[in-house]
Each structure stands twice: as structure tokens, then as C-alpha cells.
Amino acid sequence: LACSMAVGLMQINSGLNFFFGLPIDGVTVFAIAAIMVTVYVVSCLTGIKKGMRVLSSFCTIVFIGLMVYVLCLGPTRFIVDAGTESLGVFFNRFFEHSVILPTMAENETWSKSWIIMFMASFFVYAPIIGLFLARLGKGRTVREFIFMNIGAPTLFCIVWIAIWGGTTVWLQYTGIMDVWQSVNEKGLEVTIFTILSTLPFAKILAAFFIIAVFFSFSTMADSIT
């Protein structure tokens, strides 16, 4: 929870600095954290059906709206083609990457860079989130539970990664923006906002994105308490 909050604070502060000129310092981070914790406490006190439901619905609408906006005004054809091809490659190499280990290739970085990091996150979140999902599943059929907790989130992630990943690759490929240089010089937390800056009404998009990230932490923290 602390690591997630730290990442969220970095991203929010970086976005406010990139588009609106707010300083990146301890005072700003503390102010953002104080507001974030306040929203989280209010969400917890009002319960799942009120505070958390409202925040979750708002975040869902914003994230879906951002996806549709980028898909329509971004490189639509490239996104569809790259997303379809990438999904095929993912399914084709899923089992290979699931069991890959650097047995004889000491310089192999896939398992070190990705698998171990993911597994550590899963071990931390799985028990707590599992209890939360079980609570939500009370009174629902197995089919409804599987669709809402596995099917719908999986589909959302596929579309989200296809749209944002495709746009990022297209910007790098066409030379419109050097995404990799931005990652190295400014960090991952700023790169999403440099990508947004290439789209029309960038500041409005950034504002909605920052608010959604802000509320997403509150809903995530609420679900594990």
C-alpha cells in the first residue's frame, strides 16, 4: 500500500508540474498525500455502496473515456493492427514466458525484470484482494463472479494496453516523440504526460487523468482495509 501510494504521489506531482507548473517538493507531495488520505478515510467510512462505488464508477468512466479519445484521435489503424498482433504473440508465447528461467543464460533478463516483480506484487495483494472479492461475490452466481472479477478486468487490460502501448510505439516509430529518451531523462511517472501532450486538449486530458489516478488509489486502499 505504501509503495502504491508513493508511485501515485510521484505520478500526480509530476503531472501537476508538467502541465500546471506546480513544484516537485516535499510540501506539494505532503499536501497531495493529505488530500489523498482524507478521501480514502471518507470512502472507508461511507462504505462500499456509497463512497467506493461512486469513486470506482467515476474512475471507470474517465479511463474508458481516455481510451476512446486516444483511439479515435490517435493512430487508430496502427493501434488496432499492433494490438491484434501483440495479443496473438502473447497467447503464442504465454506458457513459454510463464516457465522461463535463466538456467543456462545468465544474461537473460526476462524473469529477473518482470516475473519476479510481478510475483512479489501478486503475493502481497492476492490474499487481501481475494477476501475483498469474496465479499463482493456474496449473493451472486459463479458465472457473474467470474465475469466481473476475471473476464471484464482482463478485457479492459487488453484494450488499455493495446491503445496506450500502440500509441506509444507509434510515437517512437514515427519520430514524433522520443519516448525512450523521455523515460531515461524524466522517468516513467512523467512519460505518460509527455504522451498526452501530443494529443489535442492535452491539459484537459491530463487533469482528468490525474484525478482518476488520485481516486484510484483511494478505491484500491479501501478494498484492502
Regions found by a protein language model. Give the residues of each.
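Membrane-water interface regions at transmembrane-helix termini and the short interhelical loops
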Residues: 14-19, 36-58, 74, 129-142
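Select transmembrane alpha-helical segments in multipass membrane proteins
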Residues: 1, 30-38, 62-73, 107-113, ...
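Extracellular/periplasmic helix-exit of transmembrane alpha-helices
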Residues: 70-93, 154-186
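Transmembrane alpha-helical segments of multi-pass small-molecule transport proteins
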Residues: 20-46, 65, 119-131
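Transmembrane-helix bundle segments that line or gate the permeation/cavity pathway
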Residues: 1-18, 29-32, 42, 71-74, ...
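Membrane-helix boundary/coupling elements in multi-pass transport proteins
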Residues: 3-13, 127-149, 203-225
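Membrane-interface interhelical connector segments
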Residues: 92-108, 166-203
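Membrane-interface loop-to-helix entry segments
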Residues: 3, 46-72, 82-92, 147-153
